[in-house]
């Protein structure tokens, strides 16, 4: 018989390749990351588990550091939760860490901010291995112009021009802490840190910055588009394949682990593995 005790709350850090998933959130008849994680943890707990995530990523979007919490009466060592869940998860989803947290902790509401990275590969021929993990760009990109243009988005603004038409948020006001555009060889990465995001906000920003990088618009166009508060003035929504939930920030006192993927990222790309901390 499984050992049980008082209800406690656990947090886990999850990495996943979102290519074949219809997003994080559980949806009837669709393959989702939440469904896979809940089934795996329920097997370890020996009772149904419901997980709540820091961010609900869309179909095809990846995560290096998704954070989720769940409640359980099952008594298991942390290592048992991590390894046990991974034994029930598909190869494109992995739990890297687990920790017990206070019952007041909430993966989404306790978070102070989130960072996303949007990755573009600029080369003349389409990629094969990276086809579902980057946005392929045939033409050269002016990275400096993209970075210059992006600075107009820093601070608190109405991001109506960069929200999806179907976005259900009651307000378009969001605060962007930092946004950078960096390039190393064929790889270009947009990194944005904000308190919260609108539906498709990062991908719409990426699509607009790509127009600046390609020379189709001047850097000042981004500021003009932001001020217009009109979705039709911005660029197209960039493909989901290039987007990664990179980091979720919590109060330091909680000692939530950083992304397990940060060091391999630096080795593979030559770009910094860790984000600038705006706190």
Residue ranges and their predicted role:
Residues 1-279:
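Structured-RNA-binding interfaces characteristic of tRNA pseudouridine synthases
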């Amino acid at each position: 018989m499984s050992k049980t005790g008082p209800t406690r709350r656990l947090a886990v850090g999850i990495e996943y390749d979102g290519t074949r998933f219809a997003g994080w959130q559980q949806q009837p008849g669709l393959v989702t990351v939440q469904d896979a994680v809940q089934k795996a943890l329920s097997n370890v707990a020996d009772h149904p588990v419901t997980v709540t995530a820091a961010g609900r990523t869309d179909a095809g979007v990846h995560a290096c550091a998704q954070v989720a919490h769940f409640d359980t009466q099952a008594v298991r060592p942390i290592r048992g939760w991590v390894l046990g869940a991974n034994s029930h998860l598909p190869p494109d989803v992995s739990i890297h860490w687990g920790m017990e947290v206070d019952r007041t902790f909430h993966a989404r509401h306790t978070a102070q901010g989130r960072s996303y990275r949007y990755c573009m590969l600029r080369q003349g021929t389409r990629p094969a291995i990276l086809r579902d993990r980057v946005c392929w760009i045939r033409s050269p990109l002016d990275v400096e112009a993209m970075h210059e243009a992006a600075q107009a988005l820093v601070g608190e603004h109405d991001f109506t021009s960069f929200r999806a038409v179907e976005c259900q948020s009651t307000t378009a006001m969001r605060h962007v802490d930092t946004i950078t555009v960096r390039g190393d060889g064929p790889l270009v990465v947009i990194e944005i840190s904000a308190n919260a995001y609108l539906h498709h906000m990062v991908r719409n920003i990426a699509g607009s910055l790509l127009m600046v990088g390609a020379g189709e618009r001047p850097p000042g166009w981004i500021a003009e588009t932001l001020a217009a508060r009109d979705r039709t003035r911005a660029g197209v929504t960039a493909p989901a394949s290039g987007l990664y939930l990179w980091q979720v920030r919590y109060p330091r006192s909680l000692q939530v682990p950083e992304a397990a993927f940060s060091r391999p990222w630096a080795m593979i790309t030559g770009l910094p593995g860790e984000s600038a901390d705006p706190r």
